[in-house]
Amino acid sequence: MYKVTVVIALLFLGSSLGFAQQDSIDVGVYYHPNATEEISQKEEEEIKNCLSDFLLSLQPGQNRSKTIDRSDFGLNYGFINQAQYSYAHKSSTHFKPGISFVKKIDDDTFEVKISFISATETPVLKFIHALLLKRMSDGLLSVFSTFERNTSTWNRQVVGNITYVYKDSIGFDHQRAIEMYEFSSQLAVLFGCEPIAINYYKFRNPVDLFQNIGLDYITNQYFGEMGGFALQSKRMILAANNSEYYPHELCHIYTHQNRGGNSFNPYADEGLATYLGGSGELSLAKILQYTEEVFLTDDKDTFVEFKSLYSRMPNDINFAYGISGLLVENLHREYGFEAVKELLYSGDTFESYLAVINKYLHITEANFDGRVRQLLKEYNRRNNK
């Protein structure tokens, strides 16, 4: 997974169809100049009230609404909630949501562009979000993702248990799709389940991906030339690598779908995905070779570096992903996949991860640096000759 780590959270069911009305609280939605030239004053008020109620309902402690707990909204809820959460808590990076453009599609449908600008001494544009507002049977507007509309005319092709969705102009590599299906079948054997049916959306690059899910602008989209993420609960991969093959993200879907009632550990989850599927364009072997030869100098404390799950090395790969991949590889080779599953579903804390690693590999906080360096050297001698 490349520099953008996207955490997608689905909302809890609320008690009413419409947004919670909290007229006493102003969430700060405002119009930019000339944003409403195509609409009437009445529609202008409707749109502002709808978005104010929507953003308010995302704040901690407010009522959650079924209107925004639809299956399509996992695609952009995370970004809006991040912005509104910061705004609600008046942090140094809170945002002001401004409506920069409204396009009237018909009397009951509007496309809205919202700009989130930091409310700081020197304002910074964080992102521009596209949303669809549709009038429901009760006459009120409701918020929808633009993703379904943006991809509705794309091609669809099924290979095994994978449904690929892609633009005509991108094309389709059937051989890579077969390789992805074969990898899915291998994961199914490991987890003792049937191959999981997934939807795989293929994009050229991160800019293409973000714009199609409704983010017209976000700085992250320019950080790398490839990447993507999985929506595990929806069994969907959004691949910004211009390829039909993305094994790392497929691993995340299998770990999520096979968790039962257990919470899975993020360190173990990324470790398994990197062990089996690499990260970025690099295999685990290449990642660990770089880690030992370039990154892990004598002055670094491996334990400190590892605890920061999303800290990246100069080659744009997460250090913890590679080291956790190393530990998962050792577990699998020496104790079998049941030990790996014990680590995967050990709980969502770093302490629970370390407890299982200590149980099998006798690695503690005190000896972490020495033991990991030793295992790293041994792995590279075996795999990077």
Q: What does each model-found stretch correspond to?
A:
Residues 154-264, 352-356:
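Juxtacatalytic substrate-recognition/specificity segment
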Residues 1-4, 20:
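Positively charged n-region of N-terminal signal peptides that target proteins for export
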Residues 21-50, 58, 62, 69-178, ...:
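Non-catalytic architectural context of zinc metalloproteases
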Residues 4-15:
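Sec-dependent N-terminal signal peptides
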Residues 37-49, 170-181, 237-245, 262-267, ...:
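Soluble non-cytosolic domains of exported or imported proteins
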Residues 261-385:
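Acidic/His/Gly-enriched intrinsically disordered linker/tail segments
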